[in-house]
Amino acid sequence: MSEGGGRVSRIFAAPTRLCRWPALIECGVNLTQPLCEWMIQVARDRTLSLAWEVASLLTLSSSEVGLEGVGTIWPSSYSSEENSRNGAEQGRQLSIEGPFQGQNCPSHPAAALPLPMRGESQATSCQV
């Protein structure tokens, strides 16, 4: 079945194929291409941020990584010991609650659509 040029599938028919975020399906979110792209960008940003926090560069001096004269490499989140603990806690929280916890959806008409009635749930799937 197609609608507006995109493929539409029942929410419960293939939950893992809708942008690979089944949790959103449970909330009845209508996924459009711009919304999917935004979700992908948020996931990439979070992944890069978390990768920085656990990178082995944190324990290396600048000379060991070929950056003589630059100084020690520290991500901004590690400016103090307290921030280090907070960053570690945040990393654990993200892994438990998912990458979109606390994120605001972009302003998009799809976000303002009413939720479908029970038994009529549909969402536009986008291939990632």
Curated annotation (Swiss-Prot):
One of its GO terms (cellular component) is nucleus. Keywords: Cytoplasm, Nucleus. Its main location: cytoplasm. It comes from the Eukaryota. It is found in: Cytoplasm; Nucleus. Residues 77-128 are annotated as: Disordered. Residues 77-87 have a biased composition (Polar residues). Interacts with PRDX6. This is Saitohin.
